[in-house]
Amino acid sequence: MEITEVRVFPVNEEKLKAYVTITLDHCFVIRDLKVIHGNTGLFIAMPAKRRKDGTFKDIAHPLNSDTREKMERTILAEYDRELKKGAAAPARATGTDPHED
């Protein structure tokens, strides 16, 4: 499995830093991953749905730690590139909807 596209949609919140959409093997899209700033730094949160009891259940997630680490490295690298690109641009469009294609 290859991550063939990563789209980062930065947000300016205290903990939530970006929404992310990834494409796997040019044929499968996963939306609503999140870049979160936690106590130990940045990490990726998988898309989740709130259950009736108030807990969250992942909608999609890696089945092993190697895949999770590969996804996290790839997504965080693209997040860093997006931040640098945004810092270099004098005027940046805001309000981009991560659900549009």
Curated annotation (Swiss-Prot):
The keyword Transport does not apply. GO terms for biological process: division septum assembly; sporulation resulting in formation of a cellular spore. Keywords: Cell cycle, Cell division, Septation. HAMAP family: SpoVG. Could be involved in septation. PANTHER family: SEPTATION PROTEIN SPOVG-RELATED. Belongs to the SpoVG family. This is Putative septation protein SpoVG. It comes from Anaeromyxobacter dehalogenans (strain 2CP-C).
